[in-house]
């Protein structure tokens, strides 16, 4: 079976950088097992699969290399950008069905995609010490930010971690510890950012 996968970067600046996602059109006849296999072959954090829907304009499912997730923001942007660039959709307002519900998406005349998502929910907090060993930085450095380490969800639960200016390039994340932490605490991943 040959399946065309569009490789799209969201959040680019002047066509550079961004967050990559796979986008597969006409996915109605694909099983979840096939979607997972395709996602594993693509190897990006998420691949979006577009299917027809009776109530929404499209149903969009999102798969990582390990399984389906409820929602993915950058893959949503990639999905509707692809539909616009391929002249399947024009500028306007649309709705997509995801595992978290029906969400609006707008495509502006210049092709910019704007999406609505759930309001952020704070789900949990972790100690500086607990996180420091996982990302390879002293707990005192994390604590110096005076910001909590929280699980925030707008559809997927992520651990949000701030580090002081100059420390982002110094962290040494342990991929195995992160994977184990995420599985144990039912979170998707870590979002680490540097304070200015």
Positions of predicted regions on the chain:
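Active-site proximal loop and beta-alpha junction motif in alpha/beta enzyme cores
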Residues: 1-71, 77-196
């Amino acid at each position: 079976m040959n399946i065309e996968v569009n490789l799209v970067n969201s959040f680019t600046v002047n066509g550079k950088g961004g967050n990559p996602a796979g986008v597969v059109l006409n996915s109605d006849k694909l099983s979840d097992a096939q979607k997972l296999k395709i996602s594993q072959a693509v190897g990006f954090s998420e691949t979006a699969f577009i299917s027809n829907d009776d109530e929404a304009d499209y149903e969009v499912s999102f798969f990582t290399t390990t399984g389906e997730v409820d929602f993915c923001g950058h893959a949503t942007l990639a999905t509707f950008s692809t539909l616009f660039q391929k002249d399947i959709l024009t500028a306007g307002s649309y709705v997509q069905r995801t595992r978290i519900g029906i969400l609006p998406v707008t495509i502006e005349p210049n092709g910019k995609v704007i999406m609505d998502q759930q309001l952020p929910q704070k789900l949990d907090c972790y100690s500086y010490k607990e996180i420091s060993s996982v990302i390879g930085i002293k707990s005192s450095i994390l604590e110096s930010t005076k910001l909590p380490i929280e699980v925030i969800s707008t559809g997927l639960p992520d651990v949000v971690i701030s580090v002081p200016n100059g420390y982002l390039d110094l962290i040494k994340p342990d991929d195995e510890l992160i994977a184990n932490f995420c599985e144990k605490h039912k979170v998707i991943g870590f979002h680490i950012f540097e304070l200015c």
